Amino acid sequence: MARRGRFALAPLAGFILVAPRIKVMYCPTTKVACSSLKLLLAKANGSYDAARVERLVGPHIARSQTIHERRVNGLPKLVDLPLREIQEVLASPEWLRVYATRDPLARAYSAWENRIFSRAPGTPDRAIELCPDELADGRVDVAASFARFARAIAEHTDAFMEDHHFLPQTHIVQPDRFDYTMRVRVEEPEEMARLVAEVNRRADTRLELERHNQGFGIPLAEVCDKHSANRLAATYAMDHERFGYPTRTFAAIVAPRPLGQVEASLLRSFRGAVEQLQAVSFSARSLAGVRFGARQIWKSLARHATLGRAYRDPAQVHW
């Protein structure tokens, strides 16, 4: 394992993954096609382990989200490599060093829809408290709820930045500190296609980019007015400036956008499923912890009783 103290950029490299077989370094950014790109790289690298999905106890809403588990994607973190390998990854012309970006406002909308509106697991409680549902005639008003979020993140930014889904993209990829060789914009199909082609060339595969984590399908223009857009543009000003995304023009006022009957039912079902999943996941993790602890106690007693002859294999001591 790399000693982080000897790797000067380690504090900035916590998100970066590597696909050693195809020599690709990738910095995933949440809500920027990261599920799709991780799956692509894991398959190309030959490290994707679908069999492990069934044994996970974490709260995953969809099977596609399990690709973020290291045990599933098999992609090591840059900071966990030996120092010599880190230096090669960061400097060798043989390595592709890539990151993806997305329009900051579109990304913020996607993050709100997933983390706040849908109550995705792991969302900070304080962020959800700051963004209660806004109602119109007794129905959830998506436009007013999104406006509430835009005000909240502008006024209480720190409460949201605990969740990396809301972090500015510049804070994650650190483009001024790492020598990336490719940047792709997810809005540009030809750029994404170029990345997929390069990965396939390196892996000698014919993989395609799969789409995951689709939202409710409500266009941003239906729920975002110019006031919300301005607040979010200010919050993510560094992304607009660094990545060259222009500010967009929105209507001064948007009409209420209450959820339809089917949409409201879907939202209730989704939130209910999240609550149940979190409860089941907590119970599963607790049970796994109890079983692990019991095994360790038994092994300790067995080793003591046999004067160290039992469970002598170091690889089995903590299994």
Where are these regions (language model features)?
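Membrane-interface amphipathic segments in extracytoplasmic regions
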Residues: M1-W319
